[in-house]
Amino acid sequence: MKKYIFLFFAVCAFSVYANAQNRTGDCTSYTSDDRSVTFYLNDSSAIQLRLCSQSTVRIWFSPDGSFQRSNPSFAVVNEDLEDVGTVHVDEQNACYEIFTPKLRIRVNKSPFNLQIFDKYQKLLFSDYADKGHISNGQRKLEYKTLRRDEHFFGLGEKTGKLDRRGEAYKMWNSDKPCYSAVEDPLYKSIPFFMSSYRYGIFLDNTYKTEFKFGTESRDYYSFEAPGGEMIYYFIFGKDYKEIMKQYVDLTGKPIMPPKWALGFAQCRGLLTSEKLSYEIAEGYRKRGIPCDVIYQDIGWTQYLQDFEWRKGNYENPKKMLADLKDMGFKVVVSQDPVISQANKRQWEEADRLGYLVKDSTNGRSYDMPWPWGGNCGVVDFTLPAVADWWGAYQQKPIDDGIAGFWTDMGEPAWSNEEQTERLVMKHHLGMHDEIHNVYGLTWDKVVKEQFEKRNPNRRVFQMTRAAFAGLQRYTFGWTGDCGNGDDVTQGWGQMANQIPVLLSAGLGIIPFTTCDITGYCGDIEDYPAMAELYTRWIQMGAFNPLSRIHHEGNVAVEPWLFGEEAEKNAKAAIELKYRLLPYIYTYAREAHETGLPL
C-alpha cells in the first residue's frame, strides 16, 4: 500500500513539475515604481514591464523573480528614451491595463498573458495561449501568437530569403568560409527582427539564442535562450523606418565613415608586401580606374599580433605608405585578437599581466589553435586594463601612416556551434557561453575608442567580421568569407546569395557594409571563363555602401586580368559609383544620424 501511495504522490509531483514547464503561471499581484510595473505569478516567477518611451517597452521574464543579470547590457546604451511620467495601472477583474499615447498594454491574470494594442485597439503582439513565458532550468522560452498574414524581417546578416517566416535561426558567431546560400549561423549575431504588424523585437541576450518563425506550429513563433536573462524590447512604429530608428535610440548611432571609405578598395589574401602594393597601385593609376584603398591582409605582421611589419616583405613601410598616399591611396591593415605563442615577448607579457582569456579547467591562459601563426593566446577585451595596452600596440602602424583597420577572425576564428571544447574559456566578465557572441564587439570597442583617444579629430575606419547588436557604434561590417563556387554556375548562385545577406545586414543596423567582391573563396582563376561573372560581381559591388574586391590566397582579382571587355565594364561600374558619391555621402550622413540603410 505504501508503494502505491508513493507512486501516487510521485505522479502528482511530476504533473505539477511538467505543468510548470509548459504553462505560464497566474498573476497574483503587482508593484509599480516610476517607469516599471512588476507582475508576480503563482509559480514564483515575475515579469517586469518598463516603459522606455510611449512606444518601446522592455519586457523581463525572471523565473525566480530576482531580476538579476550577470553583466549590464553590451548592446543597449540608453533605455529611458523619453519622459513617460509615472506608470498608472488600471486593475480590472480579469486583467491589468497600462496606457500610453501610442499603446494599450493588457495583462490577463489567469494565466498571465501579455497583449499589446495600438491606440486604435488593433492587436499588435500577444503571448501565445497559456505558454507565453516558459522556463526549463536555465532555458527560457517565449511563445507568441502568429497571424496567418504576419511576416518577419531582420536578424542581421543571414542567408536565404528576406522574409524569415517558416525558418529557424541561431545566434552564435561562427567562422563559415565559403558558406552556402542556406548556411546558419554566420559571423554576426543581431537578435533584432521586425514584424509586418508594425513592431520590432530586440532580444537582449548574448547566449546562443534561437528564433523559430512558425517552424513548430502555424499558430505561434518563438524565441529562446539557454542561459542568461530573458530580456527583450517591444518597439512599435508606424513603419519599419520608425522601428529601426527607435532600435538605434536604444543601441546607439552608427559611426560616420571618412569619405574615402565609400570609394573602391582592393585586397587579396596574400597582399602582404611592399612590392605587390606598389604594383597594384600603379596598375590602377595607369589604367585610370578609380580606387581609394589598398588593404594588407593577415600576413603583413611579423607575428600575431605585434603590429610590426613583416621583415623581408616590407623594406621601408613608412616610405611605402607615404608614396601610396601621394598616389591617392589609403592603406588599411588587418588585426587579429590573439597573441601568437611564437611571439614570445608579447605573449609572455600578456600572460604575466593576466590579459589573456583563461582555461577554466587549469587556470592558465587558454591555448587556442589558430588558422595562421600557430597556437595563440586569446586577448581578453572584457578586462578594462587591456584597452590601453592594446591601444599602444595598434598605434604603431597608425604612426607609420596607415588609415585604419579591419578586425578579422573575432568569432574567434574556427568557431562553430559544434566546437564545445571552447566553452571552457573564462573571460573577465564571464564564461565563454555568455561572452562568445560579444567577444568581437568588445574588441571592436577597444579598437575604436583607442584610435579616437590617440588620434583626435580623425574619423575611425574599422571594418569587422564578427560582432553583436550595437556594433554600429564602433565599426563597419563585411559579410565574411563568402564564396564564388567551384565553377561558373556555382559562382552565379553565390553572388546572388550576397544580395539578401547585404540587404538583411542593413535591416540589422549595419548600414556601412560590403561583401568580398568576387567571393573570398572558390575558383576564379580561369579569367576568360569568369569574365562575365566577374563583371557582375563588380557591378553588384559598386552598390555596396563600402566596396572591396577580395579573394583568398594569392589569387589576383584586379579588373585588368579578366580581359579587355571585362576591364572596360568594371571600370564603368566603378566610375558610376564615384559619380554617385555626392549622393552616397549625403545618405551616409543620414545613416549615421538614423541608422537607416543606404
Residues covered by each model-derived region:
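Aromatic- and carboxylate-enriched substrate-binding clefts and catalytic-loop regions
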Residues: S73-A75, P290-A570
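Bacterial Sec-dependent N-terminal signal peptides
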Residues: M1-T24
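C-terminal substrate/ligand-recognition segments
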Residues: C267-G269, S277-Y278, G283-K286, I549, ...
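Glycan-recognition and catalytic regions of carbohydrate-active enzymes
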Residues: S174, P559-L598
